[in-house]
């Protein structure tokens, strides 16, 4: 008899629109994955801070920081891959919605990290969602689309 693993933490409605494969294959991978997408991070959150928080739920295989595809600087997301599915379920249950660097983090299932996904998919190099923000968020580190469209001048920053 075949055993089908039912996650103790439900899958979200979000699906990666760039997934290379069928919807059925993506669902299967999500149900069995030990990889999580972590969103709404501060641009200043370090890999060490993420490791400290998420290792409370189990042994971490790796953390892949999300980077601006042009500047190669952190852009507010990462992937956390555990060795065991149960540890990722603990993180979904206990860390999703908690604060890290004074931001409420979003934790969601991921079908598994593939090289290249660490780069932001937005036109300006960061995340798409940041391009639609209308405010300046110090924790996120940018003005979003308003600067890109010339609606605001770039913030005053001194170069060291």
Curated annotation (Swiss-Prot):
InterPro entries: NCBP2 (IPR027157), NCBP2_RRM (IPR034148), Nucleotide-bd_a/b_plait_sf (IPR012677), RBD_domain_sf (IPR035979), RRM_dom (IPR000504). Component of the cap-binding complex (CBC), which binds co-transcriptionally to the 5' cap of pre-mRNAs and is involved in various processes such as pre-mRNA splicing and RNA-mediated gene silencing (RNAi). The CBC complex is involved in miRNA-mediated RNA interference and is required for primary microRNAs (miRNAs) processing. Also involved in innate immunity via the short interfering RNAs (siRNAs) processing machinery by restricting the viral RNA production. The lineage of its organism: Eukaryota, Metazoa, Ecdysozoa, Arthropoda, Hexapoda. Keywords: mRNA processing, mRNA splicing, Nucleus, RNA-binding, RNA-mediated gene silencing. The keyword RNA-binding applies. Residues 34-112 form the RRM domain. Component of the nuclear cap-binding complex (CBC), a heterodimer composed of Cbp80 and Cbp20 that interacts with m7GpppG-capped RNA. Belongs to the RRM NCBP2 family. This is Nuclear cap-binding protein subunit 2. GO terms for molecular function: RNA cap binding. It comes from the Eukaryota. PANTHER family: 20 KD NUCLEAR CAP BINDING PROTEIN, NUCLEAR CAP-BINDING PROTEIN SUBUNIT 2. GO terms for biological process: mRNA cis splicing, via spliceosome; regulatory ncRNA-mediated gene silencing. One of its GO terms (cellular component) is nucleus. Gene3D superfamilies: 3.30.70.330. It comes from Culex quinquefasciatus. It is found in: Nucleus. MRNA binds at residues 14, 37, 106-110, 117-121, 127-128.
């Amino acid at each position: 008899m075949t055993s089908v693993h039912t996650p103790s933490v439900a899958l979200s409605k979000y699906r990666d629109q760039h997934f290379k494969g069928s919807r059925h294959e993506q669902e299967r991978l999500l149900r069995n994955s030990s990889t999580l997408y972590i969103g709404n991070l501060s641009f200043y959150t370090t890999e060490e801070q993420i490791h400290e928080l998420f290792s409370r739920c189990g042994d971490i295989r790796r953390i892949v920081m999300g980077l601006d595809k042009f500047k190669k600087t952190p852009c507010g997301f990462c992937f956390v891959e555990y060795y065991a599915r149960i540890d990722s379920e603990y993180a979904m249950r206990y860390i999703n919605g908690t604060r890290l660097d004074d931001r409420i983090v979003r934790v969601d299932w991921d079908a598994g990290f593939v090289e290249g996904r660490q780069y932001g998919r937005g036109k300006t190099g960061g995340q798409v969602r940041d391009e639609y923000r209308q405010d300046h968020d110090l924790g996120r580190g940018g003005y979003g689309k308003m600067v890109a469209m010339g609606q605001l001048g770039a913030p005053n920053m001194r170069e060291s």
